[in-house]
């Protein structure tokens, strides 16, 4: 029987995070609270299956994600499920991913979202698919096999674009990568946590040059 844990980096997502946590009580969950200024930390008393790791300062999504993965690779879980705190990923995606793991035992699963939110994200994904047969590299919904992740990031020092760099490591190491189609909801209309649409597009262009 595989053991699964869910990892959720979160910054000022109290309302959507609460909704998510209320629907995944059957799983062990770790939330990396990235120095939120709302009442996210108060949720720790409402969900006994959730461990809250509170950052003393805001370190950003990718650093928070890496911190969580480093913590969980030392735990006795077979797979680590990552998902976003903004409600973009449907809860049904979790069960779908779990079932895929039980049938195929992949090293990594990528959740192919039904919608993408940025023009450059769509373009990048199409090119990425042609080269690597991976449809949605920027999806925050992924499932990592813990023993493989532990080996691949043993001596890894986080880089500026960890999110795409980790995927690159899995590809170059010829790991077994699978994918599932997942339903995705529209992200709330608010300022991006990483600097707005212009800076996100610049980030994707840089990732494109870095990866190819």
Model-derived features: where do they sit?
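Short beta-strand-to-loop acidic/aromatic patch adjacent to the donor-nucleotide binding site
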Residues: 77-88
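Short, well-formed alpha-helical segments that are part of the catalytic scaffolds
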Residues: 7-26
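Cell-envelope/extracellular polymer assembly enzymes that use nucleotide-activated donors
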Residues: 3-5, 165
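Conserved donor nucleotide-binding strand/loop of the catalytic core
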Residues: 42-74
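Conserved catalytic loops of nucleotide-sugar-dependent glycosyltransferases that act on lipid-linked
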Residues: 64-65, 116-212
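A conserved acidic beta->alpha catalytic loop
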Residues: 33-42, 87
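Acidic helix N-cap motif at the loop->helix transition within catalytic regions
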Residues: 15-19, 38-46
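Conserved donor-nucleotide/metal-binding helix-loop-beta segment in metal-dependent transferases, i.e.
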Residues: 93-109
